[in-house]
Amino acid sequence: MLNDQKIEKFRQIVENKFQIYNSLFMSLPYDKMTNIGMLLPFLYEESKEGYQLGKSPEEIVEDFFQKHTELETEDQKTELLFKIIQYIERQVVLFDSIEDAAFQQLHSESDSGTVMNLYDRATQEHHLAAIRKKMDDFAIKIVFTAHPTQFYPNAVQRIIHDLRDAIINDSVTQIDTLLQQLGKTPFVNKERPTPLDEAMSIIYYLRYVYYQSIGELYRKIKQVYGTSNFTPSPDIIQLGFWPGGDRDGNPFVTADITLKVAEELRISILKDYYGHLKNVRRRLSFRGVSDVLEKLSKKLYASIFQKDVKISAQEIIDQLDEAEKILLEQHNGLFRDVLDDYRDRVKIFGTHFATLDIRQDSRVHQKVVDDIFVKVSGLAVDSKSNDEKINYLLESNAVLNPDDFEDEMTCETLKSIYNIKLIQENNGERGMHRYIISNSDEVKDVMNVYVMMKLCGYSEDEINIDIVPLFETMEGLDKSEEVMRTLYSDEVYKKHLAKRNNKQIIMLGFSDGTKDGGYLKANWQIYTSKEKLTKISEENGMKVVFFDGRGGPPARGGGKTHDFYASQGNTIANNQIELTIQGQTITSVFGNKDQAKFNFEQLLTAGIENDVFKSIKKDLNDKERQLISELADISYKKYSDLKAHPMFVPYLQEMSTLEYYGRTNIGSRPSKRGAGSELKFEDLRAIPFVGSWSQLKQNVPGFFGFGFALRTLKDQGRFDEIKELYKGSDFFKTLVLNSMMSMNKTYFPLTYYMRNNEKFGEFWNVLFSEFELSKAMMLELTDYKILMQEEPINRKSIKIREKIVLPLLSIQQYALIKLQKNEGDRDTYEKLVMRSLFGNINASRNSA
C-alpha cells in the first residue's frame, strides 16, 4: 500500500472512527459525564492557545475554571480535574483499541520485513538456499520483563481486548456496552502488585495472544520455506520471562515466588494444550486416533489439577506420534495438518511456555560469597582477595544449607539456586537455564555464580545453566572485552562452556547505558563492544549470543527495532536476536495476535536478511567509524557536563514526576536503588529517570548532546562528511531517526514557565537550547522539513495522542506547581500528579 493510500486509510478507519465512538462517551449514564465531555474541548483550547502565548499551566487551568465553570472552592475544582483525568484515560483506551483494530487493514502480508516479502526477495535474488541455511542456526527470543511501565490493570486489559474485537466488527451496541464497563472499571491498583501479580499479568498475554500468534507464524514459516528436505526448527521463535525471577533491586522476589511463577507457566501452557486438544479431537474423531487423544486429554487434565501428576513435552509428542501413525495407516492421513500444527506448538512451548531467567546484582553476589567464605573457611572476610576466595571455594567440598545462614539475602540467593534443579525437573531444562548478573564488570562476577552453584551441590555435569554477564555502564562496557578474554582462558569456566556447546550469552544494557553515557555514546559503545566481544569469542572458538536489554523509547534502546537489527554490520555476531520487551511495549507492540505476529516476523527477518543480503551500508569503513566515534565523544562530553550540573538531580526531584513513580502501584520494584533519603544520580533507575523526562515532554536522554556534536563538526566545515555518513550507514541513519522520534514527542511550551524560575531557569534554558539545536541540525542533516517526515502514519498517531493528553499535561503541571508553592491540600495535588501519570504514559506507548 502506498503512503498516500495508507494515510487516507488511517484517516478513515482510525481518525474518523475515533471521532464517532468518542461521542458515545458523552452519552454514558454516569455522573456528569456529558458535562465533562463538553468541558474538555475548552480545556484543550485554553491549553493549546495558552502555551502558544507563553502562559504557565497554572494560568491556563485557572483561566479554564474562570471562563468555563462556576466552581468556587478548591475541593470542587480538584474534583472536576479528577473527573477530567478519568475521562481522558478512557479516551486513550478507546484510541488504542481503534488503532489496534485497524492494524490488519494498514499492513499486508507482503509488507517489508514480513516472511513473504523475504521469500519473494530471496527468490528474485537466488538466495533461498542461504535463507534456509541461516534458519537452521538462528532464533529470536523475546524476553518479557516486569519493569513498571504497564499501567492498565488486568480487568482493563480484558476490556481492551474485547473492545478491539467489537471495533473490528463495527458492533456499535457492543462498543457502547464496553465503554460503559470501562467507565465503571477502576484504572488504578489500590495496592502495589506483587511479583506474582506481575507475572500473571504477562502470562495472560502468553495464553491468549502468543500461543496463537507464534503458532500461526511458525506454521506460515513452515509452509513458505519448508521442503521435503528442510523443516524450520520450532525453536526459531522463543519466549523468555523475568517476572518472578528478576531479583535485581526487588526484595519482593523470593525463591518461593520463583517456584510459584514457574508452576503458573507450566500450568498455563497445559491449559492451552488442553483447550487446543478439544478442537483437534473435533476433527480427529476416527477409531483408534480418538482413543489415543482422549487418553492424552485425561493426562493433561490431571497434570493441571493434581500436584502429583506430571507430563513432559516428550510424553505429549510420543502420544501424538502414535495418533499420527494410526491416522496415516487407517484413515488416509485426513486432517493430518491439524495434528501437525498441535504437535508443533508442543515443540515450541514445551511444558515451560517461556524460559524463566534469574537476575541479580553482582554486588549482592559478592556479599553472599563473602558470607559463604567466612562460614566455610572460618577465616575473616578480608583475609583473602576476591580471586583467592573463589579459588578456595572451588577447592572446597562443602555443600551448603541455605538455612544455616542468618543473612536473609544469602539464604534467599542459595535457595533460588537450589530451586533451578526443581524447576528443570518440572518444566524441562528450557524452563530455567540462565543466570543473569547485573552490573558485571569483573571476572569474579561470573565466577561467583559458578562457585555458588558448585557449593549448592551441583556437580560439573549438572550445571545446566548459562551464566550471563550484563555489561550496562560505560565502565562495564569498556571492561567487557578483557573480562571475556580472561574467562575464555580460565580452565574451570572453559570446561563449563564446553558443556554449554561452547556458547556464551552476553547481555548489554541499553537503559542504564544511555542514562550513564547519553544516547549517541551509549549506542556506539554497545556497537563497538559487540564487535570486540564477537572477535574475542571467535578467536576462542566460542559462539556468542548478544542479549539486548532494551526498553520502549529510543532513550532506553527502543524505537525502530527492525531497522536497528537489520543495520548491524558483519563484524557483529548474528547467531540469535534476543531482547527484552516490557510494560507498554508488550501491549502496544505485542498486544494482540496480528500485531504480535507482525512484530515477531519483523525481528526474525531483520536477523536473517542481515546475514543473507550483504550491503555496504551495513559495514562501517574506517572513516565512518572515526566520524561516529568523534560525534559520540563530543556528545558524551556535553551530556556529562549536563549530569554534573548542580541542578540536574534537584530539577528532576523538584520539577518532575520522579518522586511519584514509586507511589503509583504499577510495579513491585522500588523506583530507586538504595534506602538513603538523599537522591543520587547513580541510584536512579532507568525507567523512572527516562519516564520523568517524558512526563515533562522534554525527552532529554533521547537527544541531548547529539545536536551539539553535529554542530561542532559543522563548524569545522565537516558537515558534508556527516551527510555522507547518514546516506551511507544504516546504523547511523537508524540512530538519527530514533532520536528524531524522541524529539517529535517533546513539547517544551508546556514548561516555558520554568525559563524564568529563579532556581531552575538557567538549567531549563540549557535543555531547551540543546533541543532547538538538535532539531535544527537533524532536519538539516536529513533534508526533512519536519520530524519523522518519512513516517506519516506514526507521526499522525503521535499527533492525535498528544492532542488527547494535552489537557492531562496541563493538570499534572498545575498540580506540581501547587505542590512547589505549597498551596492547598498537598495530599490532593499529589494524587492528581500520580493519576495523570497513567494516562500520559499509556498515551505515548513507549515513554519509559
Each language-model region and where it sits:
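Extended, highly charged
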Residues: L2-P234, D256-I311, L356-R359, W764, ...
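Conserved structured core elements
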Residues: E15, V172, M200, Y204, ...
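Catalytic or ion-translocation cores adjacent to nucleophile or general acid/base/metal-coordination motifs
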Residues: A255, V261-R281, C456-K637
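Structured alpha-helical segments in the cores of large, soluble enzyme domains
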Residues: E125, I140-H147, R164-F187, L339, ...
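Acidic, glycine-enriched catalytic cores built around paired aspartates
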Residues: M1-E79, K83, D100-T123, T185, ...
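Generic, well-ordered alpha-helical scaffold segments in large soluble proteins
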Residues: V209, S213-K220, V224, D272, ...
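Structured, charged N-terminal subsegments at the starts of enzyme catalytic cores
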Residues: R121-A122, H126-A129, K133-K134, F138, ...
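Short, glycine/acidic-rich hinge or "gate" loops at secondary-structure transitions
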Residues: T227-S228, R287, D291, R336-L339, ...
